[in-house]
Amino acid sequence: MSKVSLVVGNGFSISFGHFSGLINQLNSQEPITWDVPCPSTGKKLLDSLQTLDTLYKSNPDKPHFDVFKLALDSEYCQSIGLDSFKTALESRHFLTIAFSMYSQKQRELFSTDWSWFRWLKLHRDEITSAFSLNYDLLLETALDHLNLEYYSLQENHHGYGIPLVKPHGSVDFEITPNSISYLPQYPLTTFCDLNDTRIIRLEEHELMSPRRQPLCIVPNEANKYSSYQWVAPANQWFEGKLKGTNYCLFIGISYFECDRPEIDKIVDSLPKDCVIVVANTSPPEEFIAKISGRPYIIWNNPKGPVDENGAVLSLKCLNTGNPLRKCFCRSGIPYQYCGCHC
């Protein structure tokens, strides 16, 4: 049986957004204008996050991810009378609550007809590890439907399952109750950020509640959690799983500069004969250059991991369940995906 690892980026969620129609309600590229309710006041969340609100109103025509980038720019924030520590922290709180709402919508609209779920179902028993750069819980929702246990080093868990590493944070992560104790509320009265503590995973009914310390990296921000106790050991566990991986899927990875060190480390941890699957409608040229010299396949169908007839692209023989045979040309790529005989 082949071993499959998953590396998931924003394209995974965008795929589901198009499939389900969620993108017409909540465009994940424009979260600041979502109608996110404030857990403390019941009014609009942005109204309770004054520095972020001021930053956005000063840049109403900029793409939202560029606004978040400005939240990290101390010189710019100072030039308009803002404290960049507060703008970054309020950005984390906003993104955590906003994408909690988004995750609940994903769960409501989830369908087993979605092509990526069909692919995951076909390969359920081969999946040995997963790494996600997304805050949302779409991958977790799919794994829950498959009854495939996962573990992210959270304290409130029995400690078994495949590794699910979320180094940029997750909307259901929260610091342990006994690590830093106070009653969170919006507007913020306590400014708590970047403390390396243990974590718990929140239940779904707890997602739309104020956080003591939001755990999410702001878009365009280098990972500040890389050495944290819930990230570094999880990365080591994941990298150990990669050593025996036959296929590694990079699903919807943007390969932005801020993410490259983490993505490059994954690529460098893979066996030389591991087949890399780049599932992306527009594969980043820099990423293709990074994996050149290795066996790789590109899946760029906008409808997901399916062929022109809608059949799921398989990484095993559908009749026997055995691994696919490699092409005779010694490319290292399975025969049915190798272009040498087309």
Predicted regions, residues:
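Short secondary-structure boundary/capping segments
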Residues: 19-29, 144-149, 265-266, 342
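Extended, H/D-rich, highly charged conserved domains that either
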Residues: 40-83, 121-222
